[in-house]
Amino acid sequence: MQIRLNLEQKKYGYNVYINELERIEIKGKTAIVTNPKIAGLHLNTLLNSLKCDEYFIISVPDGEEYKNLATIELILEQLFTSKLDRSSTLIAFGGGVISDMTGFAASIYERGINFINIPTTLLAQVDASVGGKTGVNNKFGKNMIGSFYQPKAVYCESKFLRTLAFREFNAGLAEAVKMAVTFDKEMFEWLENVTLDEEQNLAKLVERSVLIKARVVEADEKERGLRALLNYGHTFAHVIENETGYKKYLHGEAVAIGMNMANSLSVKLGLMSEKDALRIKELLAKFSLPTHYVLRDESAFYEAFMLDKKTQEGSVKFILSNGIGSAVMKNDIKRDDVIKILREFK
């Protein structure tokens, strides 16, 4: 299965391959960026399929807390030491953290070299690996330093998902739920009824999510409008992750909580029915995802929104669902209305 992304009025683009890893062929030097856990589980599978002139491995620490400029420096140092040039290629082999960091390193090494995404987590396959968002975190928030830099190809393999821990697998489902709530009511209904034990259903889930992401990115590559709707749940989630030091919740878990918080705000504003909000909450519960976060200080939580990348001139832009299958951006919500919702989570 192949899905094509055409960008900048079809001047360039790339393919997302689903269960076609054997097609991967690269000219020139190749650096595979991964972590010890993924390497131990899946590196041999990749190397058995990879056709390239020369490769070497860059191993980085595992975890969101290492998604920072220090790790980027580590990657760049090894690229320089190994004398990669502009004809070389980086492979991001891992989850969303690896994808984001490798893409960012590729975008700044010698002002840009090729990179390929091979996501090994469900979260990365349904969302993070497609679309060209790259970056790292800092003390001010999540993904505050980064770039838009598209991969040359993406390879999604269902077999890599078999080794995911229960919690990590479910965290990936949060991003699939996000896709469904914002753009695809039929997909939402399918998720309500499907069991994901079968590999064909997993492949269908990835395919459907990638199709949504691809069409959105084609229409709005640099997130000036439509693509911003895919940040549903993330305005709240990024604050939660930053407050908890990126250690208490996996990203998808924080997004699940963020979606529930956003839905509470939507209901209060009359954008969403309580019935739809409950259906979303029940679907998240079906996938054993959290929906509640105990706030310490609602005012401090709100002030953290000011560092959100969508905030402009002191106006917080909230991505809210106005019914399953649809979403809107609102930048005229009163602070008091948001504070009242936040108090429900104390």
From Swiss-Prot:
Localization per Swiss-Prot or TrEMBL: Cytoplasm
Enzyme class label: lyase
InterPro entries, alphabetized: Dehydroquinate_synthase, DHQ_synth_AroB, DHQ_synth_fam, DHQS/DOIS_N, DHQS_C
Gene Ontology, cellular component aspect: cytoplasm
EC number, as in UniProt: 4.2.3.4
Cofactor note: Binds 1 divalent metal cation per subunit. Can use either Co(2+) or Zn(2+).
Chain sites annotated for binding NAD(+): 62-67, 96-100, 120-121, 133, 142, 160-163
Gene Ontology BP term (one): amino acid biosynthetic process
Any one Gene Ontology molecular-function term assigned to this protein's record: nucleotide binding
Pathway: Metabolic intermediate biosynthesis; chorismate biosynthesis; chorismate from D-erythrose 4-phosphate and phosphoenolpyruvate: step 2/7
Assigned keywords, A-Z: Amino-acid biosynthesis, Aromatic amino acid biosynthesis, Cobalt, Cytoplasm, Lyase, Metal-binding, NAD, Nucleotide-binding, Zinc
Catalytic activity: 7-phospho-2-dehydro-3-deoxy-D-arabino-heptonate = 3-dehydroquinate + phosphate
Database matches in SUPFAM superfamilies: Dehydroquinate synthase-like
Entry function: Catalyzes the conversion of 3-deoxy-D-arabino-heptulosonate 7-phosphate (DAHP) to dehydroquinate (DHQ).
Protein name: 3-dehydroquinate synthase
Organism: Campylobacter curvus (strain 525.92)
Lineage: Bacteria, Pseudomonadati, Campylobacterota, Epsilonproteobacteria, Campylobacterales
The gene coding this protein: aroB
